[in-house]
Amino acid sequence: MKVVVIGSSNIDMVAQVSHLPAPGETVGDANFMQSLGGKGANQAAAAAKLGAPVRMLGAVGKDGYGSQLRAVLSSCGVDCTAVADVQVPTGLAMITVCGGEN
């Protein structure tokens, strides 16, 4: 049985910090990383990693982030032939993590 996932896909930009900044404060000890994000993309990648044949239906922008999302999903074994390229930027989520909580 094939799993079809309809949902969002974006790039998560995660900053791990020692404390949340006060208004006007710059936190200089942040550790940054990027990862696959979006409920649909995360579900598709997880199902494919568990061995299910997965097709993702969704959209990404015609930009570097969209190409990155396609590459990561494909490397997980997700069929991305039904992911549309659209003329808007790929979604980005800015996430701040402090003490393990976002």
Q: What is each of the regions a protein language model found here?
A:
Residues V72-V88:
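A glycine-rich helix N-cap at a beta->alpha junction
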Residues M1-A59, G64-S75, A93:
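Glycine-rich phosphate/adenosyl-contacting loop at the front of the ribokinase-like
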Residues G61, V88, G99:
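Residues that form or immediately flank small-molecule/cofactor binding pockets and catalytic motifs
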Residues D85, I95-N102:
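Conserved phosphate-binding/catalytic loop of the ribokinase/pfkB sugar-kinase fold
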